[in-house]
UniProtKB/Swiss-Prot annotation:
Annotated thiamine diphosphate binding sites: 168-169, 217, 249-250, 275, 346
Enzyme Commission number, as recorded: 1.2.4.4
Keyword vocabulary terms for this entry: Acetylation, Magnesium, Metal-binding, Mitochondrion, Oxidoreductase, Phosphoprotein, Potassium, Thiamine pyrophosphate, Transit peptide
Organs and tissues of expression: Expressed in kidney (at protein level).
Chief location: mitochondrion
Protein name: 2-oxoisovalerate dehydrogenase subunit alpha, mitochondrial
This protein's encoding gene: BCKDHA
Subunit structure: Heterotetramer of 2 alpha/BCKDHA and 2 beta chains/BCKDHB that forms the branched-chain alpha-keto acid decarboxylase (E1) component of the BCKD complex. The branched-chain alpha-ketoacid dehydrogenase is a large complex composed of three major building blocks E1, E2 and E3. It is organized around E2, a 24-meric cubic core composed of DBT, to which are associated 6 to 12 copies of E1, and approximately 6 copies of the dehydrogenase E3, a DLD dimer. Interacts with PPM1K.
Residues bearing the modification Phosphothreonine: 348
Any GO CC annotation of this UniProt entry: branched-chain alpha-ketoacid dehydrogenase complex
Species whose genome carries this gene: Bos taurus
Cofactor(s) needed by this chain: thiamine diphosphate; Mg(2+)
N6-succinyllysine PTM positions: 366, 390
Catalyzed reactions per annotation: N(6)-[(R)-lipoyl]-L-lysyl-[protein] + 3-methyl-2-oxobutanoate + H(+) = N(6)-[(R)-S(8)-2-methylpropanoyldihydrolipoyl]-L-lysyl-[protein] + CO2
Residue positions, PTM N6-acetyllysine: 366
Length: 455
C-alpha cells in the first residue's frame, strides 16, 4: 500500500475511534471528518484501491475507472424510448386471486386480517378527520385514500425496530405499528397529549417508541437524513434497516440525488420507497419526468430496484421483505417504486377537480382500490364475510369517534412550552424571551383565547 493510502486509512481509523453512535463525532471527530471529507470517506475502500491498480497494456479494452463498458466505433446516442419499461411486480390480480402460487407469501389468517383492519381503520380515520377540517375543527389534513396498501404492506415487512422516515402520507405505517388513535388525534388537534406539544401542523406525526422519525414539511429533506441514519446503523452493526418514503414529485428534488448517491457509495442498509401516485399536488407524472419513472433511476446509481403494484398489498410486502433481508445482510440500498393512485385531494388546501376528471378518480376508487382487492382475497378464502365487514365498519368508526371526541375536549399546551426542548438547559436569552411572552399575555390576555390553553 502506498503512503497516501496508508494516511487515508489512518485518518479513517482515527475517525472510527472517536465516533460513537451514542454521542456523535465529538470535538475530535468533526475536524477529522472535515479533513478527510465526505468524498474521501465514501470512495476509500482498501480492497477497491488494490483492485484498481491492475492495469493491462496487452489489450485495447477501456481502462477508465468511471464505468465498466466496451469501446464502439459507431456514433450512437442511447434512446430512452427504445428501452423497455421496468415491469410491475404483482401477486394478486384485481379480483384478489393469487396469480403465481410460488409468489404467495403464505401469511397466517391473523396477519392478513391485521393488514385489512389497519387499512380500513386508516380509511375511516381519514374520512372523519377530513370532515373535521371542513367543519373548522382542525386546521389542515391530508388523506391516504388509495395508498393504504403501500403503507401496510411495507410496514408489515419491517422489523419493529427498523427506523422509518416518512414524507407526510404514511400514516398507515404508524397505524400498523399500533400507534394509538388517541395520539393521531392529539397531533392533529395539537392538544396537551400531542407528543410534539402542538408545535407541528397536523399529520406531522412522530414517535420514538415506534421508531418513526417526526415528519417535516420540506420535500425530500428526509432522504439524505435517512441515508445518514442508515450509515450510522451500519457502523454500529445495529442489524436494522432504515426505510425512507417519498413521492415521485419529491424524487425530482436535489436531495433525492444526493441521498441515492451517498447510499450507493457508502453501501447503506436503506430502502428507498417511492409512492408513485400519479400526481405531485397538481403536477401529473407526464410533466414530472420524461424517463421510465423512478425505479429506472436506481441502476444508474448502482441501486437494486424494483417496480411493484402498490395496490397489491402482498406484492408490496414481498418486495419490502426481500429488500429488508438483503439490505441488512449485504449492506446495500434498495429502491422500490410502488405504482398507485392518489384518490383523495392532495390536502384540504387542494381541489383536484381543477386538474383531473371525476371519471378518472372514480375508476381507481371503484375498480382498483387496494382495500377492495384485499377484501376479495379474504372473502375467497373464507376469512371474511359481509356480516364481519358490517360489524367491523361500525366498530372502527366508533373507535375513531371516541378518540376524536376525547382529543377535542383537551386543552392546548401552555404557550410557554414553545421555548422548551430547544436546548437541554434553557440559555439566558431564551429564558428572557419566555418571560417577555408571559408579561405580554398577562397584560393583553383578553385578546387571546387563553381559556383553550393549559395554565
Amino acid at each position: 500500500m502506498q503512503g497516501s493510502a496508508k494516511m487515508a486509512m489512518a485518518v479513517a481509523v482515527a475517525v472510527a475511534r472517536v465516533w460513537r453512535p451514542s454521542r456523535g463525532l465529538g470535538r475530535t471527530g468533526l475536524p477529522l471528518l472535515r479533513l478527510l471529507g465526505a468524498r474521501g470517506l465514501a470512495r476509500f475502500h482498501p480492497h477497491r484501491w488494490q483492485q484498481q491498480q491492475h492495469f493491462s497494456s496487452l489489450d485495447d479494452k477501456p481502462q477508465f475507472p468511471g464505468a465498466s463498458a466496451e469501446f464502439i466505433d459507431k456514433l450512437e446516442f442511447i434512446q430512452p424510448n427504445v428501452i423497455s419499461g421496468i415491469p410491475i411486480y404483482r401477486v394478486m390480480d384485481r379480483q384478489g386471486q393469487i396469480i403465481n402460487p410460488s409468489e404467495d407469501p403464505h401469511l397466517p389468517q391473523e396477519k392478513v386480517l391485521k393488514f385489512y383492519k389497519s387499512m380500513t381503520l386508516l380509511n375511516t380515520m381519514d374520512r372523519i378527520l377530513y370532515e373535521s377540517q371542513r367543519q373548522g375543527r382542525i386546521s389542515f389534513y391530508m388523506t391516504n385514500y388509495g395508498e393504504e396498501g403501500t403503507h401496510v404492506g411495507s410496514a408489515a415487512a419491517l422489523d419493529d425496530t427498523d427506523l422509518v422516515f416518512g414524507q407526510y402520507r404514511e400514516a398507515g405505517v404508524l397505524m400498523y405499528r399500533d400507534y394509538p388513535l388517541e395520539l393521531f388525534m392529539a397531533q392533529c388537534y395539537g392538544n396537551v397529549s400531542d407528543l410534539g406539544k402542538g408545535r407541528q401542523m397536523p399529520v406531522h406525526y412522530g414517535c420514538r417508541e415506534r421508531h418513526f422519525v417526526t415528519i417535516s414539511s420540506p420535500l425530500a429533506t428526509q432522504i439524505p437524513q435517512a441515508v445518514g441514519a442508515a450509515y450510522a446503523a451500519k457502523r454500529a452493526n445495529a442489524n436494522r434497516v432504515v426505510i425512507c418514503y417519498f413521492g415521485e414529485g419529491a424524487a425530482s428534488e436535489g436531495d433525492a440525488h444526493a441521498g441515492f448517491n451517498f447510499a450507493a457509495t457508502l453501501e447503506c442498509p436503506i430502502i428507498f420507497f417511492c409512492r408513485n401516485n400519479g400526481y405531485a399536488i397538481s403536477t401529473p407524472t407526464s410533466e414530472q419526468y420524461r424517463g421510465d419513472g423512478i425505479a429506472a433511476r436506481g441502476p444508474g446509481y448502482g441501486i437494486l430496484s424494483i417496480r411493484v403494484d402498490g395496490n397489491d398489498v402482498f406484492a408490496v410486502y414481498n418486495a419490502t421483505k426481500e429488500a429488508r433481508r438483503r439490505a441488512v445482510a449485504e449492506n446495500q440500498p434498495f429502491l422500490i417504486e410502488a405504482m398507485t393512485y392518489r384518490i383523495g385531494h392532495h390536502s384540504t388546501s387542494d381541489d383536484s377537480s381543477a386538474y383531473r376528471s371525476v371519471d378518472e378518480v372514480n375508476y381507481w376508487d371503484k375498480q382498483d382500490h387496494p382495500i377492495s382487492r384485499l377484501r376479495h382475497h379474504l372473502q375467497s378464502r373464507g376469512w371474511w364475510d359481509d356480516e364481519q365487514e358490517k360489524a367491523w365498519r361500525k366498530q372502527s368508526r366508533k373507535k375513531v369517534m371516541e378518540a376524536f371526541e376525547q382529543a377535542e375536549r383537551k386543552l392546548k399546551p401552555n404557550p410557554s412550552l414553545i421555548f422548551s426542548d430547544v436546548y437541554q438547559e434553557m440559555p439566558a436569552q431564551l429564558r428572557k424571551q419566555q418571560e417577555s411572552l408571559a408579561r405580554h399575555l398577562q397584560t393583553y390576555g383578553e385578546h387571546y383565547p387563553l381559556d383553550h390553553f393549559e395554565k
